[in-house]
Amino acid sequence: MDHNFSESLITRKEAVVSSKGIVASQHKLASRAGAKVLAEGGNAVDAAVATAFTVSVLEPWMSGIGGGGHMLIHDAPSGKVHAIDFGMRSPIGLDPEDYPLSGEGVASDLFPWPRVVEDRNIVGATSIAVPGQVDGMRVALENFGSRSWKESLQPAIQAAEAGMQIDWYATLLIGSAAAELNHYPCTRETYLVDGHPPAPPWTAGAVPRKHFPYLTKTLKHLAEAGPRDFYEGRLASTLVEDISRCGGILSRDCLLYTSPSPRD
């Protein structure tokens, strides 16, 4: 048995019990944001939406308003389960011929699919699909929530203003993607420090934070302008311009995305 300390650490999570409600996410502060919504009288969907927006600030390597997802909602009085599908979609102009297989094994991604030339399907502007997250949250709130859109974004805005804590896990995830992040000025500026992953201090002390001024500004605008601005308004124009400048094919027509109505 290898007793090397660096290879034998055990990470544990304490069990939590509640008679009223529990919020679970990949970041404690995001879960706290959702729990606070419940404590203030919001329902489970209100808490889920607030948590989702907040975790997009605190866990950007797995969550974000540029992504998508699915939601299941159980209505206890009726016993019905409702589903909302707001997954990403391929851009209208996408041509599979632009993504030839390289024959070099599997991708350098979480998913072991066949590798594409230059990793075009997982890195850079050519990997960006039509995002459904923002509209999915709109559909959830309008059909099952009790809070306003603006209220629901406040925890995420507060988290963005405070900045993301750079702990060992954040350093690990950013470091693992540093080569790709260095390729583009915007991601290099956002996540790296002088081209290197940010890191917490070796000794005890205040944990450094990474601030995302552009994301903070975007969330504030989204809270005021409403969710459809992301697909039809100023944010949509900025999104398309930036992606086009980097070689992507996302268009304004692609962004005319409307999440389907909830289904049982």
Regions inferred by a protein language model and the residue ranges of each:
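Noncatalytic scaffold domains of N-terminal-nucleophile
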Residues: 1-32, 36, 44-225, 230-232, ...
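A short, hydrophobic C-terminal helix/tail in secreted or cell-surface proteins
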Residues: 260-264
